[in-house]
């Protein structure tokens, strides 16, 4: 149960909150509409559907039913689909607008968070493969992967959201 709970804290709580910040900040900072509203819905709901089953990929070497291990491996690899849907949508929204991103410190943080999101999810899908996991699971690779997700993606994106929204709330600019 720990892996379902612990893994889903990141995937079903921190990830949607981080993506909500990105979906809010990037279109406003670039003064451009979201590239595709339909893709945002597909990305969100496919994330919710696929992510709920991946906690068992940390238990491939223990006596857990094979069907559960198989579902977790398939869904872990399938996470590439919702992640790329979300990132393509966000990155196409800011396409040609990097000057506006560069001018806003909050948007820079959020864009950096989306890059970390790409890396942590590609890494996670790869780490769920049994042949890779036999090598990486009982070392600090897994700890580093968790830190990239929580600090690299969720933390950097949250800081970007704060940097973006605080001047709007207070009416005063932030100086860096």
Model-derived regions, located:
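Non-cytosolic membrane-interface motifs at loop->transmembrane helix junctions
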Residues: 1-3, 64-75, 137-143
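Juxtamembrane/interface segments of multi-pass membrane proteins
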Residues: 133-135
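Cation-handling catalytic/transport regions enriched in His/Asp/Glu
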Residues: 102
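Hydrophobic cores of alpha-helical transmembrane segments in multi-pass integral membrane proteins
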Residues: 4-29, 38-59, 72-93, 107-130, ...
């Amino acid at each position: 149960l720990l892996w379902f709970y612990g893994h889903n804290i990141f995937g079903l709580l921190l990830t949607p909150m981080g993506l909500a910040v990105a979906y809010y900040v990037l279109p406003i900072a670039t003064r451009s509409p979201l590239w595709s509203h339909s893709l945002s819905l597909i990305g969100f709901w496919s994330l919710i559907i696929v992510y709920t089953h991946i906690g068992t990929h940390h238990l491939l070497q223990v006596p857990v039913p094979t069907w559960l291990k198989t579902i977790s491996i398939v869904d872990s690899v399938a996470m590439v689909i919702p992640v790329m849907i979300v990132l393509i949508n966000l990155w196409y929204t800011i396409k040609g607008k990097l000057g506006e991103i560069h001018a806003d410190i909050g948007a820079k943080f959020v864009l950096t968070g989306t890059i970390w999101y790409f890396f942590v999810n590609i890494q996670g899908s790869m780490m769920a493969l049994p042949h890779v996991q036999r090598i990486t699971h009982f070392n600090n690779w897994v700890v580093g992967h968790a830190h990239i997700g929580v600090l690299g993606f969720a933390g950097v994106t949250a800081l970007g959201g704060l940097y973006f929204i605080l001047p709007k709330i207070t009416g005063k600019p932030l100086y860096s």
